[in-house]
Amino acid sequence: MAKLSKRAAAIAQKIDRTKLYPVAEALTLVKETATAKFDESIDVAVQLGIDPKKSDQLVRGSVVLPAGTGKSVRVAVFAQGEKAEAARAAGAEVVGLDDLAEQIKAGQMDFDVVIASPDTMRVVGALGQILGPRGLMPNPKVGTVTPDVATAVKNAKAGQVQYRTDKAGIIHATIGRASFGIEQLQTNLAALVDALQKARPAAAKGIYLRKIAVSSTMGGGARVEIASLSA
């Protein structure tokens, strides 16, 4: 516990939780306090001006981060015939249909993303109770149910992240690693914010981007001055 307290004290000295920082400074501070022995993830939380209780104001989608996520992603694809071949050629680790479904039912899920061709949903739909709680259920809103499975595989490998509002109307996403440069993190954050702006529900009123904060896995969190994102 002493080490944690020491770390917390060091973070508190560097980052003022009441202050809004220009985006580059916020990311710099978060990187400086990411002192764990592993390559910490850099995460962002975005408070949106929506009513999360209303279904027409939920925000969900995906975006390919220009600088990637720094994570190696294993992809499973439900497809047959030419689409299955295209998925393999694009780099999918696991491709199948009934055999893949049986593998999942047996608890063998050594993958991070599941993609499905629309014609396989009769099989995939029956796996909802297994894939859903793990955040793996394919969904057309995030581009994981698509006839173009090859492009979906390439996007997943290139650093695509999925996002959706939680019960408090907050989006949580990873925008890179502590080893990333400030410019890479800033570019990824800008891409995410741009995607969120484009996904703004028509029913959302008032200020849409309410608060943005960046943090690392074990380090501190810093609030971002939203105006600095477009500066």
UniProtKB/Swiss-Prot annotation:
Domain of life the protein comes from: Bacteria
Cite the Pfam families for this sequence: Ribosomal_L1
Q: Which GO terms describe its molecular function?
A: rRNA binding; structural constituent of ribosome; tRNA binding
Provide GO CC annotations from the record: cytosolic large ribosomal subunit
Name the CDD domains for this protein: Ribosomal_L1
Which keywords belong to this entry? Repressor, Ribonucleoprotein, Ribosomal protein, RNA-binding, rRNA-binding, Translation regulation, tRNA-binding
Q: What Gene3D superfamilies does UniProt report for this protein, alphabetically?
A: 3.30.190.20, 3.40.50.790
Q: How does it assemble?
A: Part of the 50S ribosomal subunit.
Function, in words:
Binds directly to 23S rRNA. The L1 stalk is quite mobile in the ribosome, and is involved in E site tRNA release. Protein L1 is also a translational repressor protein, it controls the translation of the L11 operon by binding to its mRNA.
Q: Which family does it belong to?
A: Belongs to the universal ribosomal protein uL1 family.
Matches recorded under PANTHER family:
54S RIBOSOMAL PROTEIN L1, MITOCHONDRIAL, LARGE RIBOSOMAL SUBUNIT PROTEIN UL1M
HAMAP family for this protein = Ribosomal_uL1_B
The name under which this protein is listed is Large ribosomal subunit protein uL1
Biological source species:
Bordetella avium (strain 197N)
